[in-house]
């Protein structure tokens, strides 16, 4: 595969930013199979954002002949008070995450954080070296990577999180670091501090954050108003009514989407239209809306922008849009839903 085709795969939606594209081009010119990673905390049920959209981007990397690694950050999970800090539960849910990504992204490697720490002799030395370049105020500003604000009552271990995530990247010897836009701060920190230590600086690729089905919100997680809305509104397993999990049946998907925020004639920050653009159009070349003939009959789109324009012009009714979205989402989720139909751990999440 030539370099331009590989670059096009990386640039493809849901990618929103590459830091920097010229550096990525050079990597493809000089490294036969670049090494990628995306790090994930282990918590509740995987959903349309955390597995499907993320998995689509991982598959783009795999198709671009990149070695892809999913880093399951079990110690970060513990530090961030997920899964009640129960190590047995963290281990069980890690197995579920591992199976899900291996099923949805054939060829991906899964790395456990605790295993890496156990086998790396240099990790904690590098942690101290990196942290010597971090001020307390800079650490506090970076806490949005774990969904925390400076105003929260934090324990000391949570202040270790930004340095740990950065040194994970160093220890894994990566060419490409990949995450949602909510992790941008840590990648910019890496770009600033790694050169001071003489460490390899990886390219950062940030993908779109799929919003939950509720009305957009702003929690003050970052100074940038647009980014704050994107991060605050992202689909989250902590808000099950606003999140479409990979285990939801057809009825649950329809019910959740029908209750979703989708104001008439408003295309901006519309979660239904975002699901269509970033999830459905990634897999389907055409999006068909079924309508009674008295309302104009069925209509099909091959371009999400054209659909958004028609919706803004009130040519499409919200319920018609939602019904079509539910139908396509169910098709996408069905194979992995069936794959996990006998996994009892899911019932406890």
Each model region followed by its residue ranges:
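Divalent metal-coordination and catalytic microenvironments
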Residues: 47, 101, 232
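N-terminal catalytic cores of NTP/NDP-binding nucleotidyl/phosphoryl-transfer enzymes
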Residues: 14-81, 177-190
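Active-site beta-loop-alpha junctions enriched in small/polar residues
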Residues: 41-43, 75, 115, 209-212
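Short, solvent-exposed polar/charged micro-motifs at secondary-structure junctions
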Residues: 48, 119-126, 213-218
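Conserved nucleotide- and phosphate/pyrophosphate-binding catalytic cores
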Residues: 166, 184-349
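Short acidic-hydrophobic, aromatic-tinged amphipathic segments that line or gate anion-handling sites
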Residues: 15-20, 111, 244-246
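Divalent-metal (Mg2+/Mn2+/Ca2+)-assisted nucleotide/phosphate chemistry catalytic cores
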Residues: 80, 86-206
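Short glycine- and acidic-rich boundary segments immediately preceding or forming the N-terminal edge
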Residues: 1-19
